[in-house]
């Protein structure tokens, strides 16, 4: 499974825009950092588009090929950001 290229990121444009709106650092397209560490990035594969999100010390993979998967990822991200803000 390879990192998402420009075409894959174009397919995720609304999701990526929502992440940027949350103020996450994006040193390279589609790769987001939090507290100086890689926190979220995307992959593309024959099976679809996926996001790897660091929850705690482990990476977890989420399918983001459709609107439901993208909404689920944003909920997880919002919860994580809210916990960190406390």
Predicted regions and their residues:
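Charge-dense, helix-prone N-terminal extensions
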Residues: 1-86
């Amino acid at each position: 499974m390879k990192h998402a290229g420009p075409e894959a990121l174009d397919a995720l444009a609304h999701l990526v825009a929502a992440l940027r709106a949350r103020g996450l650092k994006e040193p390279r397209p589609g790769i987001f950092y939090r507290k100086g560490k890689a926190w979220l990035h995307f992959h593309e594969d024959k099976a679809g588009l996926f996001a790897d999100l660091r929850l705690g010390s482990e990476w977890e993979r989420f399918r983001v090929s459709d609107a439901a998967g993208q909404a689920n990822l944003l909920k997880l991200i919002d919860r994580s950001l809210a916990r960190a803000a406390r």
